[in-house]
């Protein structure tokens, strides 16, 4: 599944920002605009026992250029909240449910 970082009209958002995937399906986050973005999973809003640091980008790492990607595969079923750390205050947050 591909998730865009930044909408086509320049909005600071994940597109889609609420979605489901089967366990083990790769999710590819792709920078869609010229803004620096990243993908960080909220350690308090992921299934118990999942290490947020193993599925998140480092807060200092950024996808700076359009077309740059970050891929993650989630296997533990449940709900995961994630955000872009530079733009979390602007509402750039999302949720994925692993079935």
UniProtKB/Swiss-Prot annotation:
Residue numbers binding Cu cation: 37, 84, 87, 92
Membrane-topology annotation of the record: Peripheral membrane protein
Domain Plastocyanin-like: residue ranges: 1-99
InterPro entries the record matches: BlueCu_1, BlueCu_1_BS, Copper_blue_Plastocyanin, Cupredoxin, Plastocyanin
SUPFAM superfamilies: Cupredoxins
Required cofactor names: Cu(2+)
Family matches, as Pfam families: Copper-bind
Keyword field: Chloroplast, Copper, Electron transport, Membrane, Metal-binding, Plastid, Thylakoid, Transport
Transmembrane segments: none
GO molecular function: copper ion binding; electron transporter, transferring electrons from cytochrome b6/f complex of photosystem II activity
Domain of life from the UniProt record: Eukaryota
Localization, UniProt: Plastid, Chloroplast thylakoid membrane
GO cellular component terms, semicolon-separated: chloroplast thylakoid lumen; chloroplast thylakoid membrane
Main location group: plastid
Cited PANTHER family: PLASTOCYANIN MAJOR ISOFORM, CHLOROPLASTIC-RELATED
Similarity remark: Belongs to the plastocyanin family.
Function: Participates in electron transfer between P700 and the cytochrome b6-f complex in photosystem I.
NCBIfam families noted in UniProt: cyanin_plasto
Protein name as catalogued: Plastocyanin
């Amino acid at each position: 599944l591909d998730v865009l970082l930044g909408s086509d009209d320049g909005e600071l958002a994940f597109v889609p920002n609420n979605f489901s995937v089967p366990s083990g399906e790769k999710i590819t986050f792709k920078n869609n605009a010229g803004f620096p973005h990243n993908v960080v999973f909220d350690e308090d809003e992921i299934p118990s026992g999942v290490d947020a640091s193993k599925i998140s980008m480092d807060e200092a790492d950024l996808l700076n250029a359009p077309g740059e990607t970050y891929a993650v595969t989630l296997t533990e079923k449940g709900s995961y909240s994630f955000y872009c750390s530079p733009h979390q205050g602007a509402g750039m947050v999302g949720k994925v449910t692993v079935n």
